[in-house]
Amino acid sequence: MIVMDGSMGNELLTRRSDLVTGLWSAQYLIDAPELVKEIHLDYINAGADLIITNTYSTIPSYLSKQNAEDKMPELIHLAGKLAREAVEDSKKKVIVAGSLPPLEESYRPDLVINKKEAVPIYETLIKELTPYVDIFICETMSSIKEMQHVIQALSLIHI
C-alpha cells in the first residue's frame, strides 16, 4: 500500500492566505517557497509515502493571469527541487510524483486544448521535473484526450 499526500493548495491557503492571486499555488513558489517545502515535509512526517510536486498551476492558463508565462520553466524546476529536497531532508524513502495537470479547468473535457498547443506545455513540465521525480501523475484529467497529450510529450522526450 502507498499513501499519497493531500492537498497542497488548501494547505498553502490555510497557512498564508495573503498570497492568493490568479497564479493560485504557483504564487507560493515565487513568494514562499520555504512554505511549499514545509508542507511537503509535514505530509511526509504525517506518513505519506508519495508526495506530488506543486506544479498544478505552473501552466500558461494560470500564469497568463499575471503575465508570468515566461516564469513557467523556472517555477516547474523549483517545484520539483523543493519536493526532492523535502524527501532528502526527511531521510525517509518517499516517492516524488510530478504533477501533470489539466491545461484548462479541472473536470471540463469540453475545454481540453488541441494537441499542437498541449504537447509543448507537457514537454516543458516533463523536462523540468524529470531530474527530481520518480513518476508522473496525470492529475484530475477529465478525458483520455488529455492523457494522450501527456503520452505524446513523453514519447518525444525519451526519458
Language model features: what each stretch is:
Residues 1-31, 56-63, 92-117:
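N-terminal small/glycine-rich loop or linker at the start of catalytic domains
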